[in-house]
Amino acid sequence: MKLLVCISKAPDTTSKIAFTDGDTKFDENGVQYIVNPYDEWYALVRALELTEANGGTVTTITVGTTTDDPTIRKALAIGATDAVRVDAEAKDPYFVAKQIAEYAKANSFDIVLTGKETINYNGAQIGSMVAEMLDQPFVSLAQKLEVSGNTATLERDVPGGAEVVEVNTPFVLSAAKGMAEQRIPNMRGIMAARTKALNVIPAIETAELTSIVSYSMPPAKSESKYIDADKMTELVEILHNEAKVI
């Protein structure tokens, strides 16, 4: 089994977020990065579980620069067989998807796995674009994945229940919560990942179809009010006069 897992970095949720150049650029000063959780906890770990049970390899692919190397090595420490970095800034989703699709096309993977979205942009576009470019089936928001031979069975939530999908390889999926459990790398994996060579390849020429106009912070949340359980009259007055919901 030959699996390709798409890996990207995302700011740690404890990092302070700021913008520069008239709010047109993300200020990376002091920002700590992590592997995007949907890529790491679900797509990568499930891929590793499958190859541990059935044999095979797990390759990660990242579109990025040397600033992405620490998160790539985290994926290697967790257990990925090898890692590819397309040497380019991750621009718009089409650009990123094109780089991944071209590499996947040239290397014939059984399954391409992505996280359902990144926690910084929440775009959820890469998986479907890659599938379209490869002319392969795409299963989104998968929460379970089992493989037998060249047939895979996937499950995902739908309103009121669950949907079970059966698809033949090769195909592309986006992994959601429930696909696997977070795996903490051990010291042996961390040490091995430090010296493992990364396969850095040039980007192919691809048009950018979108661009960032500006960034903005979400509006500040209003302060919460706490009402004692024995002051129902005060609560009713607030709901009526301030919130205007009754």
PLM-predicted stretches and their roles:
Residues M1-I246:
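N-terminal glycine-rich FAD/FM-binding segment characteristic of electron-transfer flavoproteins
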